[in-house]
């Protein structure tokens, strides 16, 4: 944050931070405009009846999700311009990887920006999505793995995928996942990508191998 304030630009700030840390690769913000994630959460009221309430802010949305299920997500402002650097990176990429991460607060927000969504649909890069290991977290209660793809398609109907990586043990609805992936133009690569110590966490090495194999086959 100090570098951003000193240089007056988040892209320059992140580049300086990367140089200081001698980091490989580059982190780019999708917009120079501060964005707020908001959403609708369906939960039971004091009388037991279901109601939908609007929540603003990523932390508030995550907390509210403990009490119900996220049914919609949005960005404010909705017309924030994307950074040219991010759009150029998408255009020039060989592969674009989506996930893993919280569906509504980590994966979908990028697709809510029209310019980014259009760039992802238009790029000549191949597209890969890593499905989450768990489907029953607070954000996605009641959603199966196939539903994650269905939600993604509902927000970005023009987005095509080439490969979906799914954990061989975590996914129980294989046929449904394959059907949803096929609707987006993708094949499913089933692989053991969870940690041997904690099956709810991705193993970095296993996931790296699975991604490498998906990209080379």
Regions inferred by a protein language model and the residue ranges of each:
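Conserved phosphate- and dinucleotide-binding cores of soluble alpha/beta proteins
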Residues: 60-67, 76-83, 89-91, 103-160, ...
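N-terminal glycine-/serine-/threonine-rich phosphate-binding loop
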Residues: 47-93, 110-114, 122, 193-217
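Glycine-rich nucleotide phosphate-binding loop and flanking beta-alpha elements
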Residues: 97, 103-104, 171-172
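Glycine-rich phosphate/diphosphate-binding loops and the adjacent beta-loop-alpha structural elements
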Residues: 1-9, 101-108, 134-138, 194-196
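C-terminal functional extensions of proteins
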Residues: 142-217
